[in-house]
Amino acid sequence: MKKVTAMLFSMAVGLNAVSMAAKAKASEEQETDVLLIGGGIMSATLGTYLRELEPEWSMTMVERLEGVAQESSNGWNNAGTGHSALMELNYTPQNADGSISIEKAVAINEAFQISRQFWAHQVERGVLRTPRSFINTVPHMSFVWGEDNVNFLRARYAALQQSSLFRGMRYSEDHAQIKEWAPLVMEGRDPQQKVAATRTEIGTDVNYGEITRQLIASLQKKSNFSLQLSSEVRALKRNDDNSWTVTVADLKNGTAQNIRAKFVFIGAGGAALKLLQESGIPEAKDYAGFPVGGQFLVSENPDVVNHHLAKVYGKASVGAPPMSVPHIDTRVLDGKRVVLFGPFATFSTKFLKNGSLWDLMSSTTTSNVMPMMHVGLDNFDLVKYLVSQVMLSEEDRFEALKEYYPQAKKEDWRLWQAGQRVQIIKRDADKGGVLRLGTEVVSDQQGTIAALLGASPGASTAAPIMLNLLEKVFGDRVSSPQWQATLKAIVPSYGRKLNGDVAATERELQYTSEVLGLKYDKPQAADSTPKPQLKPQPVQKEVADIAL
């Protein structure tokens, strides 16, 4: 009995010692000026801005996986498009009178020009190397069929010619011309089918994972930057001086440490909402999230890959979210060309591809459950669409592919599960809750913590989104002469609009193309097209948009 008692006492002492050691470890505070949560392109971009603006600031980046850029920024987990509205028809909605609205397209294109300038500047500084490893010229095309859709594309093309950002776009309804642009799309197609296409040579395919890895590798060269992998944030607590104490667990050895930061950025993709809620700031109460995944069909067969050099976007079918538009894309991944077709929507309660099935449930609170219910009730068409997508069979997906590639063979394609996209649901005074497409920077009033929510257009606009964050949380510094000069060196067009200024547009496109090794020819005269017949549009309930 004495032996048993002694053994139990010994175990208790041992366990207590382990517990005390863990507490001691957690109590050892690391201090940093900026804490970046998440090792994706958003954190990498913000860190790169701050490194130039305030080189003496210390920065710590924590990432729960074993490497950076392994979630949504990973090249295989997104479409890899340099979104600039050259081909994405959802950015040019049709008004009730049949005319085309281009405001959203212009804004998206302006944003991507900022990203191009940011990347070009980093190449010139030696931060980014070998541009072909992360960005390549791939023409962007819109392709439609049927009388109404052809008429829509005519009207869209005519409307976009009013903007300096879309000069150089080509238009054709000729089968032979379109076949020259995208042979894979036209071969085997009914020669009597009415089709139309636009093509812009300066489109791009971007590997956001590679950009992320290179940006972070450059940050790591400085002694006042620390990267902690396999590290998960477990708690955030505001201190009396408005700094933050963030508890971070080491997923490999189970220990924990506290990091005291003057500013915290939550760039954790799908996990950002839960961490924002954990912070306890009142601004977080307005938000909820709904996860949607995406799948692509992938071909690596040289007979397919070498026969297609374009990103070809179609038009979303009636009743489907505008952003769900199918596309067949040339991609450059892991140093080789592949072709992807999709996306097909999938559903999982995970907020991250490497997340937990409890993510959706654990993010649902008393303050956001009603907005979520209102969104579900108000968007039954969207619910129907998601259910229909989840129910798709292998044959259904292949038939969808054949609409864009009539001579496709099943054996050339495999299914790939891409990343999760958490859609923003925001409290609304009139509707209770609304589904918000796009990204949103949410910060506290003091400007000590900020999170990025949302999924589209995402990585392609990381540079302007983080610029917006700087203006929101570091407003006084942004207006200072020092920061203004640095920001204009990073983004030459900062503070100006390129749209409407032909000379400035061409100057920036030529500069970024030269530095990034991209194709750019001075735009020629616009193609002549049949005059679009603008028909008043029937009144229909708008389908909420989502990002896939």
Curated annotation (Swiss-Prot):
Its cofactor is FAD. One of its GO terms (biological process) is tricarboxylic acid cycle. Keywords: FAD, Flavoprotein, Oxidoreductase, Tricarboxylic acid cycle. GO terms for molecular function: 2-hydroxyglutarate dehydrogenase activity; L-malate dehydrogenase (quinone) activity. The keyword Kinase does not apply. Residues 521-548 are annotated as: Disordered. The keyword Oxidoreductase applies. Its EC number is 1.1.5.4. It catalyses: (S)-malate + a quinone = a quinol + oxaloacetate. Pathway: Carbohydrate metabolism; tricarboxylic acid cycle; oxaloacetate from (S)-malate (quinone route): step 1/1. Pfam families: Mqo (PF06039). Residues 530-541 have a biased composition (Low complexity). Belongs to the MQO family. HAMAP family: MQO (MF_00212). This is Probable malate:quinone oxidoreductase. It comes from Escherichia coli O81 (strain ED1a). The gene is mqo.
